[in-house]
């Protein structure tokens, strides 16, 4: 690749403690590009709170086109509406190589409703999506410049020889995500409580990690007050410390029905720590969690099934422990090395 600048357009939220999936994914890609191309200059267009910083961001975007040959774009729904016309418009004059690394799983549905978005997507050199099903859906709209690039993280994947069977009570279930209602916080708390009432004593406990959405904070506090006997909020942990925090848990719970869900990084964290996952079959979770191999998926419209899975796993811990090795092996698919090889082939 010629020695020329590389730009990344996306939410890095510099100077904040944001740990949502979009921000983490953008930061990770930037870090890995810097590792692969240390001799290149980088221009970062941080789209965090872009509506409050419109002029500086516009100037930064123009600078990216002036100085960089390769421009990576990572934007969610609202960001796409604002930036795509700007980026594709500027590129009519600059003719840069634009790469769209898709955030979340909502893009096919958005594109189906928007001919303008379809045209914009066709103007990128490539659109990287997280699942084969997303590629297929976009292909049906005539968008063929699409490749599958799974989400990835640089984590210290637990070695198989360090795996330990979990057999202590109460069995510790964990959630590790942004704390919003749609991630299934209430369903998880109710299910843990219902399982304990089924047993007649406390055999399951839920720990929740992650930043609390300000709009959900009061409701979440009421949830903790109601279920404080079996649900504990543990605060935030750095993204690169996730394996260390999760490895002492029994299983990860992921009862999400979040509209923009793509490939959840929290499931990669869990697999890296040797944790099987109980997840809804919402969006693409079924492509990630293999029933009976790396966890269990259940119908997201039947939350009572989560309670049943908790009861079953607590009474059959040997089945859960037998999945841990498969989780570690699966985590190996989501390392930066494999993903960056695919990305670098495009740049070179």
Regions found by a protein language model. Give the residues of each.
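Conserved donor-binding/catalytic core segment of Leloir-type glycosyltransferases
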Residues: 4-9, 164-183, 188-194, 206-207
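Glycosyltransferase donor-sugar binding loop
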Residues: 46, 205-218
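Acidic donor-binding loop of glycosyltransferase active sites
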Residues: 247-261, 275
């Amino acid at each position: 690749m010629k020695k020329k600048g590389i730009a990344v357009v996306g939410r890095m939220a510099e100077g904040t403690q944001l740990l949502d999936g979009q921000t983490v994914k953008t930061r990770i890609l930037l870090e890995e590009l810097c590792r692969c191309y240390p001799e290149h200059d980088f221009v970062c267009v941080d789209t965090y709170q872009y509506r409050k910083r419109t002029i500086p961001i516009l100037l930064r975007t123009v600078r990216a086109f002036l100085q960089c040959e390769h421009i990576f774009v990572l934007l969610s729904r609202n960001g796409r509406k604002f930036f795509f016309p700007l980026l594709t418009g500027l590129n009519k004059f600059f003719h840069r190589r634009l790469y769209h690394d898709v955030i979340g799983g909502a893009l096919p549905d958005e594109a189906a409703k928007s001919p303008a978005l379809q045209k914009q997507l066709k103007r990128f050199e490539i659109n990287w999506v997280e699942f084969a099903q997303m590629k297929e859906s976009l292909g049906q709209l005539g968008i063929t410049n699409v490749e599958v690039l799974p989400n990835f993280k640089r984590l210290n994947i637990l070695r198989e020889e360090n795996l330990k069977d979990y057999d202590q009570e109460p069995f510790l279930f964990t959630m590790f995500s942004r704390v919003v209602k749609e991630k299934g916080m209430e369903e998880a708390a109710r299910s843990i409580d219902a399982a304990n009432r089924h047993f007649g004593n406390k055999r399951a406990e839920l720990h929740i990690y992650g930043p609390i959405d300000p709009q959900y904070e009061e409701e979440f506090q009421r949830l903790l007050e109601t279920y404080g006997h079996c649900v504990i909020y543990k605060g935030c942990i750095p993204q690169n410390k996730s394996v260390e925090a999760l490895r002492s848990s029994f299983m990860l719970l992921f009862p999400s029905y979040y509209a923009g869900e793509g490939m959840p990084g929290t499931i990669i964290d869990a697999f890296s720590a040797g944790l099987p996952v109980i997840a809804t079959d919402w969006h693409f979770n079924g492509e990630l969690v293999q029933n009976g191999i790396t966890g269990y998926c259940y119908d997201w419209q039947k939350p009572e099934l989560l309670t049943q899975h908790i009861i079953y796993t607590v009474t059959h811990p040997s089945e859960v422990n037998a999945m841990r090795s498969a989780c570690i092996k699966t985590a190996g698919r989501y390392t930066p090395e494999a993903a960056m090889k695919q990305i670098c082939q495009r740049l070179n």
